[in-house]
Amino acid sequence: VEMNHDVRTVRMVGKPLPKTVRPWLGDSLGHWEGDTLVVRTTGFHLQQNLRAAIKHQFYMTEDSVVEERFTRTSKGELLYQFSVTDESIYTQTWRGEMTLRSSEGPIYEYACHEGNYAIKNILAGARQEEKE
């Protein structure tokens, strides 16, 4: 799942990182349950307590546990499910899900720079390539 410039490593083997190591987006461990990739993330960086990835803000602490499930439901669809558990700030686990659909054509890297002054030429080149 892409969100701006965030990059998260999901390790498929190993143990959780020591508590002294706090990656900005947490420590993600994944495993397969049949055809579903399950990712459990803990150990969020203390300054990463406010998320706005789904148009709503929610708080996270160093005790937060996020479980994500990625299941291919058809050739072009992926069911994304998540749950957030943190007894220090929430009275119960809360959940959400959405269907992610593949797009036609290439997916370009999300990269920008101050002013984005080159975007006009980048888009012009892409439109020319489409015409050819």
Where are the regions a protein language model picked out?
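Hydrophobic small-molecule pocket/channel-lining residues, especially in calycin-type beta-barrels
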Residues: 1-132
